[in-house]
Amino acid sequence: MVEELSGGNPRCRRLRRLARDRGFRHGEAAYIVEGPTLVAEALDADRDVRQVVLPTSAAGHDLVRLVQRAGVDAFLVPDRVFDGLASTRSSQPALAEVAFHDAEAAALASTSGPLVVLAELGDPGNAGPLVRSAEAFGATGVLMVGGVDPYNPKLVRAAAGSSFRMPIATIDDPVAAVRLLTDTGVSCWAAVPHGGIPPTEVPSDGPVALILGNEPHGLDAGVVEACTGLITVPTVGGVDSLNVAVAGSVALHALAAGSG
C-alpha cells in the first residue's frame, strides 16, 4: 500500500525546501532527485534514498514496485501538488529525497586517474555535463571549489546519473585545491582560452588534473600560477573560444586518450 499525502503534509513542505533552498539542503544533508530514470539510477548506485513521491496519475508506474522492493517509503500526492514540489515544471512523474554522499578531497588527491577541478563554476547546466563527461572519460573524481552547489537539482539532472557514481568533493579555496593536488604528485593543468599547449601534449607520466574556471571570467591569476602548466583546446575558423562544458569535455577526452 502506498500512502497518499495532502499538499500540506510536512513531507511535501520538506521536499519543496530541498528543491529550492541550498542552505536547507546542506543543513539536512539531503537533496532531491527528479524523474523516474534518475530515481532508479540512484537506487541502483546504492545511494541512501529516503523517500519517493509520485503524482497520483503515476500510481501504476513501474517505479513504485522498484521502490517498494528496495524497502524505500513511497507516497502519492495529487498531481497539482506534485507540480509544486519539483524545482521546475516537468512531466517527470517522480521525486526522491537522497542523502548527501560527499567524497573527501584528500582521498581524491591520492587517486591515480585524471581528476577534474571545477573552480567557481556558477551554472549547474555546465557543471552537470562536466560531471557526466568526467565519468564517461574515466576520471576518478571531481573537486568542486565554490560556485554551484553539487546537489543543485539542475546539476543533478544535467549529470544524468553520473553524480551518483562519480566521487565529488568540495573545497573552499581554488589555490588550496591546486596545492593539495600538486603536493600529492598530481600535475595540474589550467584550461585557458589562448596560450596553452593542446591537451593531447600533456605528459602522461603521472596523475593529472584538469582545472576549469567559471564561465565569464575563467581562472584567477593565482590559480593559474599555482598550476603545472596551461592547456588550450585548439579551434579553427572564426571560433575563438568554447563553452566551459564543451572545452572541458574535449580536454578530458584527450587526457583520457593520453593516459590509456
Show the residue positions of the predicted features.
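Boundary-proximal intrinsically disordered activation/regulatory segments immediately upstream
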Residues: 1-65, 147-149
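Short acidic-hydrophobic, aromatic-tinged amphipathic segments that line or gate anion-handling sites
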Residues: 3-7, 73-78, 167-176
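RNA substrate-binding interface of SAM-dependent RNA methyltransferases
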Residues: 44, 101-103, 107-195
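Short, aromatic/basic amphipathic alpha-helical patches
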Residues: 60-71, 222-223
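Glycine/small-residue-rich loop that forms an oxyanion/phosphate-binding "nest" at active or ligand-binding sites
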Residues: 67-97
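Structured adenosyl-cofactor binding patch, chiefly the S-adenosyl-L-methionine
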Residues: 96, 133-137, 147-150, 155-163, ...
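Active-site/ligand-binding-proximal alpha/beta "capping" segment
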Residues: 189-239
